[in-house]
């Protein structure tokens, strides 16, 4: 789809969407996004130029269908997939990708740490994906030194980062915000450092007593990202891993650094979004969103959850979707899904489905609350179908049509019940939606009420 679009850009020093937007150019990707979002093309260009919106679109991911992440666009959902040393393989990950796209993932992150050749897995995922692909290059950097963190060098990180860019990765989580001076701030936490990438960098700094190499070589990463139009997803290495640790000094110190790095990337017209927590009580979610906007100059916020309680292993797609809906309402641009397997194991296909649907609900609820154009249209159409007992239309409009039909058909499977004016909840005699009050009847009632006082029986 994008082969012709990007052909004329190849070889230029900077091919980022932000670079073109700041020159006043409306790219084909911006036109495409404007149509998808039902927004003016000028607004898309201006938001990208300002840094409040990103269009993650590596020039080597030519089968990508461009999308936007930003406060002016619909709230988006990311799904994580990835093989581990103990579970999964290439085909399973491609199957998970296809499932994630089927159930509405706007982007997908490949978090593979093992399970085969990581380059082959990543290449297969990018080739198969119409949505932006994100990665965490620190994972493969660690694999390249056989898991010995102390042996990692800045060149190891940069080599893997460029490899991912060359392969077509659209955005990369870069854990450049955790600094050596931040590490003592986690002393009073219950769960310490829960970011895998952050933990790797922390151990490296503790061993070498040197500054984070991703921070000291941040300009080198910018130069790579300019050449391929890779977007930064600035990792929150010190995100809270439990509600006790939320909004603490460590988290906020790193957030301030992430704001500085955001503005540094913008100096070279490189797109940025900023990752956020995590585990946050409901009463602190608005503060966290507002604080990110303040520190990071309104760069798009991308949060994991947040989980609003820590006591529901097996149900963390619910505990986190509650926080995600609130975060989206307050202005978070993208929500990273959490599956029922969070904290327990690697998610399977059914976990991916359940996590995604929970987060599509959260994102859609946020869009309605923020009065985004057309956000409630689908709700209204489904409500009309429900009132008219148009069961097949209800299924069609559902976020998960197969599940809706499956639940209906558990008790009323025959085709005749697809036109029935009841379901198994109320049966044929008690459904209140059978009470159809037409306009003429209401007009007559209004005339009566205007003339006669209502008597109490």
Swiss-Prot record:
Keywords: 4Fe-4S, Iron, Iron-sulfur, Lyase, Metal-binding, S-adenosyl-L-methionine, Thiamine biosynthesis, Zinc. GO terms for molecular function: 4 iron, 4 sulfur cluster binding; carbon-carbon lyase activity; zinc ion binding. One of its GO terms (biological process) is thiamine diphosphate biosynthetic process. It is an enzyme of class 4 (lyase). InterPro entries: ThiC (IPR037509), ThiC/Bza_core_dom (IPR038521), ThiC/BzaA/B (IPR002817). Belongs to the ThiC family. HAMAP family: ThiC (MF_00089). This is Phosphomethylpyrimidine synthase. It comes from Nostoc punctiforme (strain ATCC 29133 / PCC 73102). The gene is thiC.
